[in-house]
Amino acid sequence: MSYSPTAENFAKSYQKDIAQVVWTTLVADLETPVSAMLKLADGRSNTFLLESVEGGKVRGRFSIIGMNPDLIWKFSREDVFINRKARTDSKSFEKINDSPIDSLRSLIAESSIDLPEGLPPMAAGLFGYMGYDAVRLSEKIPDNNNDDLGVPDGLFLRPSLICIFDRLEDIVTLVTPVWPKSGVSSEAAYEAATERLSAAVSDLQRSLPFRRERLVGSKQIDEPLSNTSREEFHEMVNTAKDYINAGDIFQVVPSQRFSIPFDLQPMALYRSLRRLNPSPYLFFFDFDEFSIVGSSPEILVTLRDETVTLRPLAGTRKRGANTEEDKALAKELLEDPKERAEHLMLLDLGRNDVG
């Protein structure tokens, strides 16, 4: 098996204290992102799978698996924690005396790697989420809600193994980032990197792990429970209208959280969502104490080569019974003044945020 770069070229960058990646490429026409996730993760925590689906039917070009983080960063309210021993102890967090935004900016700069030409842009870096409550880091918004979930407001992993599926080329690229460490020679660092890649290749070549566990849940499905009553939700909507009429706000999203018992593995929920949901972007994060499973109909924002791209969606219609009805509904959406105004508002909001 061949690895890139060569040990000689790796040593040249390593001795200059330059972070870099080591990678290998395999043919992947018989593998899927889900099967690879099951083989590579195999019950490990702090793993993730990001998939793109074009049009809800045809799998998109890139899907990404990440695992074995060497570093985990998280924050709750104003408290920031980092674990630089994540490979050996996933709970070894230390508190940082810095703001969440400043510490994350520093970590992004620390984790930045100039990738060789030809590698996808997601071949190294930080992967995770920022929750809605993170808005309070930049806006003075009161927080009168109880923290009844107890999950971090933001959490990012720095995986030491990244598996990138390229459906256009039918290949999978296995990547391991390497940050120079004092006392570790370039030879030892390169050997460790190639061993990580070799182990991943072996995992991909084996059969799917067999477990004696149920693949379907109970036939009796409980009714979802909301965290608010119908009357309370109506009052929230009326209050929002009052704020809009008073000129205090011009957009708000009233929400409620539904909960239901789930006795299967989180991956089972993701697989069901993947099959049934038409949204083109799906994500699965399996952390130590909780998991996040979801999908999105839009990219929303992309930053690449110093260019910010906003692609907000607005306006919905029920799908037509045939192609002709779909085209008519699409034309109706494009000509609807209300939908056009909402698009312009979302673009203005995005421009304001970027500015």
Give each language-model segment a name.
Residues M1-G355:
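Extended alpha-helical targeting/anchoring segments
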